A protein has these predicted regions:
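PLP-dependent amino-acid enzyme catalytic core
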Residues: 1-104
Length: 104
């Protein structure tokens, strides 16, 4: 069942919510095998890797799947086929400056 949590700050501001909506929660509960919590540092690392290696500028929220994979939080094998949906448009200049300090 959905649980209300304390409001958090994150570079992935599009994903921050105190409580999921009932329809969204029901869909996710039915169609997923698990969840992963991804730190801002991992989101920024994924963003930088996508920018430098893939030439893709993405918003932090869309880097969450890749951030979890880079951290080893997804049960993936080298032979698995994986798809992450990457989008842009919600990138603040401050976030781009933060990428300068991120180590790959």
């Amino acid at each position: 069942h959905p649980v209300r949590v304390e409001q958090q700050r994150s570079v992935a501001d599009a994903l921050v919510a105190q409580k999921p909506g009932d329809v969204c929660f029901a869909y996710v509960a039915k169609n997923t095998d698990g969840f992963a919590s991804v730190a801002d540092a991992d989101l920024l690392r994924a963003m930088k890797l996508l920018l430098l290696e893939g030439k893709l500028l993405c918003e932090p929220s869309s880097a969450i799947g890749m951030g979890a994979a880079l951290r080893g939080q997804l049960p993936l094998r080298r032979t698995d086929k994986v798809c992450f949906v990457i989008s842009g448009g919600n990138v603040a200049l401050e976030q781009l400056h933060q990428l300068e300090d991120v180590r790959l």
